[in-house]
Amino acid sequence: MPINSRTKGASYERDIVKILNEFFLKNNFNLTCKRNLDQYQTKNLSDINIPFHAIECKHYKEGNWLKPDWWKQVCTSAEAEGTIPVLIFKFNRVPTRVAI
């Protein structure tokens, strides 16, 4: 059965939110984050917001490095929000990578 890319992306965003929130809690940061559900209704919004950062998450089946369009997308979101762009991306059977 084919995988719905929107569902796969949302699941990956939830995984990243969980990892970030566990990190914040473990390291006594007074922060929490959640998925930005407004991203589906409003253009140029990031997937996840934490103070001063716009986070875009990408999970694809194949590849080994970020696509320039992904970086442009997160930079556009960050500029609109006045924050620092962060791209978190993963391909199947490849570790997660982060570009800042």
Q: What are the functions of these language-model segments?
A:
Residues M1-I100:
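Catalytic phosphate/metal-binding cores of nucleic-acid and nucleotide-processing enzymes, i.e., regions
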